[in-house]
């Protein structure tokens, strides 16, 4: 290799083409290339020069030659130095010089090497066909995957995982969980191939109804990750430990902190045993049973309670006398000396005074601008932030890294705000912040980082998203709070780093132009970005304009958030504490502060919750598909949920078990409903819910067994159902318990709807509306945390968890309870995995109150509709109805409408008693209509869930309704959140009548 480089140096002057050839043809890495760590010891020079490490380094060196950063002579020396280093790794070490380590169990893992390989299914020559239900797809054969296993050496731990990406032709896509092909000792996991197939079926089970079953579902990608670790002993867990024991939240740990004595010896002696280096640990201690724990997140810094420790399956108990409970990690061992017993108490929600938080935490507001590269990854090129009244920015490939370093240099506790940061900005900064923190924790929902805490040596960084409180775009929020106007920026003109330095003679605005073309029974729709140039001359680069735009965004966000908090404090006497991170949390605090003193809202046990949760029925959607070219009237309920909370009674107190129904009280019951009619009666209103195969439906039925609240059962009686009770929970008291809460917010909203305040539109109304919409009721029915998500080191945590023995139900121990073995998925396939722990936590809110509010809301709308005999509702969604005008007494209908709490309101936009002249209904959340507004202008309203409004037209809905075989295919771009990065994805969404 060096001879070739020397020859090249002597023969050519302009060598760029030859260097490119040499880079691609000589320093070549393919699927057969081996790592230096998988080569046999004392391999030949040629074998070492064929390794991944040598050739990857060669490619880097030749890139530097091409850029004229180094000479060929320097390159030769560097390659020779690399070879000598790799040869030293490949040599057999003198075992006589190796210090003997007492036991492998108390060593720590150090990452020696890690790599990954992305394979297209076409790379596998002997792929086999996997068939499941109506699906058939090619997957790698078992032998081909086994052939990828590296050569195994002793003294190393191997984490070798495979995961498959499954995709459909339109919107569907899924990734299987990581499956270990070998265990950490290098032995093949005999059942790995069956587990791969099992995980494929779980992905295929999620194929939604809008994917045609005969559609081609394929295995698109096979990702292999390999991490090689080595055990190396270290001394201790904590710095400057002086005490013998440490008290955690629910257990006490003997630390074995005497640095002059072997920690294992200290533990043996503490357990009443005798130290003897010739014996195993089991023989040295009197306890017959040993349970060994390791930190769940593979770091002792994260351990605060038993919930942060994992162990093999074991019968949960707190016996620390007859069982030796050892905590082993990072070259050290301790003894758990006491485990506190769980004390179950009946939780109660009651009136609480809102605490005013005085914690000193600085605030930083930031925004990121990025472009989408050829691989569809979002590439940040600019970050702006505000701190202590000053604006800063960084640009370039390292802008995020530089921002994180700057923030950490402040050495103070900081709340980091980004508008919609939970779904975008935090996913860019997280890898840099996580790599530097001591420990961290997050609340993750739907791949959104709704909250985060990252601990550093001199600071804590909190991640909070203002959007999760105000629930609208920054543009709309800026207008509602009368702050600086947010600008617009043509993001789509940037495709590469080079574009940033361009100067457009005239600045540009982007308009989206819809393109349609028909293919058989399918109408295909996509859009193009059209550039509209301004008249004024532009002298700034694209980057300079982006900086100004980004600064305005940061200022707007800061001003909105500060004003929102000040208005909350002034008008509702509440502060947003550091650890309050959503609107529903905030509203629940306000609601609890307004409860009557005598009210105690009972929180159900997990066993009770498992029953009453079946009475939670979500948003009611009724859709009578068709083309309606006649007069249609619309109405919605003024603040439906708040009206149900104020105008109807709700229960409180501890329930009792019953097998009957007392309609003078409130309860939640398992009943059989039997309709008196044999077929759907005329004028039946679809308000009685039921679930069939977990799918919610509102259609008429003859007989059904299910769980229902009293308000739902009152509706059922009115609709001709006989009710037979099997069991239930009856609550002792009921009252108008939410009146103070609703009155405070609703009167505040109404007072500032047409007020004479200096600022108009009045932002106080916006604050009241936000708090009212949050309602608190959403928290009542929030299910207990059934899934914990962690961002962990790639492969390593998965490998250690896979070692743990499970019971026949596939359960291991986390702390004091049994849970299913954690699931692991690749995140960036470089540094991090997503770990999911499925569990059942106790409820923390009064679930029956949420059920009561949901049921009462249906009852409110039902009673409003029953005012009109023969009413024909063609579409209804939660709080709104579309009605054939001829089916109601129009004058009576108008007289019943108004703007008071709980009334029907027939206003569309600003037009009262609007008449819809044409309406197309294609299914739930899929409709379009036209109406004349109060200025005699024809207005079109379009709605199709999951499709951007700018892609919709009335003619599309007309085409859809002409035939049940007609399909519309919308093609657009979406953002996929990966927690540690963001990608864009071209999506095709097929729409048919449902």
From Swiss-Prot:
Transmembrane segments: none annotated. GO terms for molecular function: DNA binding; DNA-directed DNA polymerase activity; nucleotide binding. It is an enzyme of class 2 (transferase). The keyword Nucleotidyltransferase applies. GO terms for biological process: DNA replication. The keyword DNA-binding applies. Keywords: DNA replication, DNA-binding, DNA-directed DNA polymerase, Nucleotidyltransferase, Plasmid, Transferase. Its EC number is 2.7.7.7. It catalyses: DNA(n) + a 2'-deoxyribonucleoside 5'-triphosphate = DNA(n+1) + diphosphate. This DNA polymerase requires a protein as a primer. PANTHER family: DNA POLYMERASE, DNA-DIRECTED DNA POLYMERASE. Belongs to the DNA polymerase type-B family. This is DNA polymerase. It comes from Kluyveromyces lactis (strain ATCC 8585 / CBS 2359 / DSM 70799 / NBRC 1267 / NRRL Y-1140 / WM37) (Yeast).
């Amino acid at each position: 290799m060096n001879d070739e480089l020397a020859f090249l140096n002597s023969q050519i002057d302009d060598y760029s083409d030859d260097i490119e050839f040499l880079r691609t043809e000589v320093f070549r890495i393919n699927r057969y290339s081996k790592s230096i760590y998988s080569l046999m010891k004392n391999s030949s020079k040629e074998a070492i020069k064929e390794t991944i490490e040598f050739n990857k380094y060669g490619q880097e060196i030749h890139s530097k030659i091409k850029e004229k950063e180094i000479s060929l002579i320097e390159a030769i020396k560097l390659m020779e130095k690399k070879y000598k280093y790799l040869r030293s790794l490949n040599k057999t070490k003198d075992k006589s010089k190796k210090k003997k380590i007492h036991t492998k169990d108390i060593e720590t893992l150090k990452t020696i090497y890690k790599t990954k390989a992305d394979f297209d299914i076409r790379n596998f020559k002997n792929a086999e066909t996997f068939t499941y239900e109506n699906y058939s797809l090619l997957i790698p054969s078992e032998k081909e995957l086994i052939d990828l296993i590296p050569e195994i050496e002793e003294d190393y731990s191997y984490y070798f995982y495979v995961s498959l990406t499954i995709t459909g032709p339109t919107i569907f896509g899924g990734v299987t969980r990581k499956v270990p092909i070998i265990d950490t000792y290098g032995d093949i996991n005999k059942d790995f191939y069956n587990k791969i197939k099992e995980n494929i079926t779980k992905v295929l089970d999620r194929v939604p109804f809008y994917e045609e079953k005969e559609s081609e579902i394929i295995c698109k990608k096979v990702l292999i990750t390999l991490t090689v670790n080595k055990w190396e002993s270290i001394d201790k867990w904590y710095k400057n430990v002086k005490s013998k024991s440490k008290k955690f939240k629910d257990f006490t740990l003997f630390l074995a902190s005497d640095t002059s004595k072997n920690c294992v010896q200290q533990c043996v002696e503490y357990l009443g045993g005798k130290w003897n280096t010739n014996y195993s640990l089991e023989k040295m201690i009197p306890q017959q049973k040993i349970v060994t724990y390791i930190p769940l997140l593979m770091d002792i810094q994260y351990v605060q309670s038993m919930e942060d420790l994992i162990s093999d399956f074991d019968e949960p108990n707190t016996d620390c006398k007859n069982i030796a409970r050892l905590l082993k990690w990072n070259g050290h061992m301790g003894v758990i000396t006491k485990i506190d017993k769980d004390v179950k108490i009946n939780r109660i929600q009651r009136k609480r005074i809102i605490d005013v938080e005085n914690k000193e935490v600085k605030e930083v507001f930031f925004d990121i601008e990025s472009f989408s590269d050829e691989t569809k990854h979002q590439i940040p090129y600019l970050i702006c932030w505000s701190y202590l009244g000053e604006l800063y920015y960084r640009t370039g490939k390292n802008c995020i890294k530089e921002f994180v370093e700057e923030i950490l240099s402040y050495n103070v506790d900081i709340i980091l705000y980004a508008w919609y940061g939970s779904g975008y900005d935090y996913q860019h900064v997280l890898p840099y912040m996580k790599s530097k923190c001591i420990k961290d924790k997050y609340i993750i929902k739907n791949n959104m980082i709704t909250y985060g805490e990252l601990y550093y040596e001199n600071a804590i960084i909190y991640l909070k998203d203002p959007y999760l409180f105000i629930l609208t775009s920054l543009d709309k929020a800026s207008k509602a709070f009368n702050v600086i106007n947010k600008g617009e920026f043509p993001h789509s003109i940037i495709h590469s780093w080079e574009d940033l330095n361009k100067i457009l003679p005239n600045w540009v605005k982007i308009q989206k132009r819809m393109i349609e073309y028909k293919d058989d029974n399918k109408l295909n729709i996509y859009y193009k970005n059209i550039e509209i140039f301004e008249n004024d001359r532009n002298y700034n680069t694209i980057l300079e304009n982006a900086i100004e735009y980004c600064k305005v965004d940061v200022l707007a966000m800061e001003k909105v958030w500060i004003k929102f908090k000040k208005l909350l404090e002034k008008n509702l006497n509440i502060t947003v504490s550091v650890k309050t991170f959503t609107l529903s949390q905030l509203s629940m605090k306000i609601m609890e502060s307004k409860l009557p003193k005598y009210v105690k809202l009972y929180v159900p046990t997990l066993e009770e919750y498992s029953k009453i949760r079946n009475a939670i029925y979500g948003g009611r959607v009724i859709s009578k598909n068709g083309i309606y070219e006649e007069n249609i009237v619309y109405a919605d309920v003024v603040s439906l949920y708040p009206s149900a909370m104020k105008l109807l009674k709700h229960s409180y107190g501890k329930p009792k078990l019953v097998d009957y129904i007392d309609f003078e009280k409130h309860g939640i019951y398992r009943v059989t409903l039997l309709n008196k009619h044999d077929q759907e009666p005329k004028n039946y209103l679809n308000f009685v819910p039921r679930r069939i195969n977990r799918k919610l439906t509102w259609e008429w039925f003859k007989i059904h067994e299910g769980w229902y609240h009293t308000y739902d059962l009152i509706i059922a009686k009115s609709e001709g159902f006989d009710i037979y009770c099997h069991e239930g929970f009856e609550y002792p008291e009921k009252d108008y318990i939410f009146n103070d809460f609703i009155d405070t917010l609703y009167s505040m909203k109404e007072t500032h709807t047409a007020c004479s305040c200096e600022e108009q539109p009045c932002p106080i109304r916006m604050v009241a509306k936000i708090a009212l919409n949050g309602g608190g009721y959403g928290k009542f029915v929030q299910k207990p945390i059934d899934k914990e998500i962690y961002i962990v080191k790639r492969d390593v945590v998965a490998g250690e968890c896979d070692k743990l023995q499970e019971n026949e139900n596939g359960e291991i121990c986390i702390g004091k309870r049994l849970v299913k073995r954690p699931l692991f998925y690749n995140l960036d396939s470089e540094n991090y995995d997503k770990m999911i722990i499925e569990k059942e936590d106790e409820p923390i809110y009064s679930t029956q109150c949420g059920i009561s509010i949901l049921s009462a809301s249906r009852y409110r709308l039902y009673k409003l509709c029953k005012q009109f005999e023969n009413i024909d509702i063609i579409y209804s969604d939660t709080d709104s109805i579309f009605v054939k005008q001829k089916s109601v007494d129009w004058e009576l209908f108008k007289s019943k409408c108004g703007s008071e709490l709980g009334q029907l309101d027939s206003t569309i936009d600003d037009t009262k008693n609007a008449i819809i002249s044409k309406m197309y209904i294609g299914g739930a959340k899929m409709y379009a209509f036209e109406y004349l507004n109060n200025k005699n202008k024809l207005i079109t309203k379009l709605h199709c869930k999951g499709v951007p409004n700018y892609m919709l037209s009335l003619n599309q809905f007309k085409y859809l309704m002409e035939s049940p075989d007609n399909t519309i295919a919308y093609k657009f771009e979406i953002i996929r959140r990966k927690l540690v990065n963001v990608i864009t994805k071209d999506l095709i969404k097929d729409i048919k009548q449902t």
